Amino acid sequence: MELPFPTIAVSEGAANLLVPDVPRRKGPGTAGPWPFYNPTMAVNRDLSAIALANWPHPLGSLLDGLAATGAWGIRMALEVGAKHVAFNDRSRDATRLIRENLRRNRLAADVHTGELSSYLVERRHDFVDVDPFGPPTPFLRAAFRAAKERSGIGITATDTAVLCGTYPKACEKRYGARPLRSAQGAEIGLRILLGYCHGLAAARGRQIRPILSFSAEHFLRVHVLVESGSASDSIDHVVRVDAGRFIDASGADRGAIGPLWLGPLGDPAVVRHLQPSAWSSVASARLLSLLKSECEMPPFFATTDELAAAERHSPPRLDRFIEGLREIGYRATRTHFHPRGVKTDAPSQDIARVFRELSPTGSTGDSRPAS
């Protein structure tokens, strides 16, 4: 097949794909006049396949809404076994490449050339994937407007500098929320994205239930179920008061963050049963293990860096610190959001006490919970 750009054959998951053979760099990638493909996003597609294979109810039809090479939809067809997968992209070169990739994987599917918002006016699917180059916001209103009862939406956001606090004014303009550049920036950004999704669903008299949400590399990813229901009490503002501790706040409060989603980032009934597939990478399996360990933990976390600065003690080994919190009856685990972060339900005074006791530079006495 003749295409106006060079191509190369690659394998990803269960799929064999023809993709543009163009220079690549780390991070979100570089757009060009060719269908976009970023191999580092394989982790995204690995976790999508695992989530959709364990979705709370059967999914009859899936839409790869901004399909590019068709990698997401083809992998879902092969790995999830969806009965019907459709593809949409506004580029004719992209839809030609998608058809070739379908042929290579011995699949048949509907392939449409056009704008996603127009496509969604005419067609409905059980799950719509929105994975753009750039922010997802231009496509989300149409996606939520078209969402059927108990349908799902998967959203990838690569505008992490905006959501995670580097450009707070851009975040307020784009998502209607104030972020915070901090160790917790990725979790805050993910919760802002979910809060934005909640607002779009609420405008249609519906609510969202996050099934699986995470941060990885240079992107944020959410999978949500859209259900009927009244406004959620999971939306609020918070303010940071000390290392890893945030409390509810009014949107008018100085330093207030949000509005953002404060409910679970995933459905524990689903997440705790997820297992890597035969096609999952080592990186995906490692990420999934962390997501399972923290899926029932409260929002936000502290890092040993923050605690070391606050307590003026050298940090203990992370695993020993977690063990110390567990020994006095609290839940504690690593978090995928930060390599030195700890999620726990311990109050701040006990977090600090255990940290000081286990610090290699000194001890402050016993570590019984504070009364």
What are these regions (language model features)?
Residues 1-371:
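SAM-dependent transferase fold signal centered on methyltransferase-like domains
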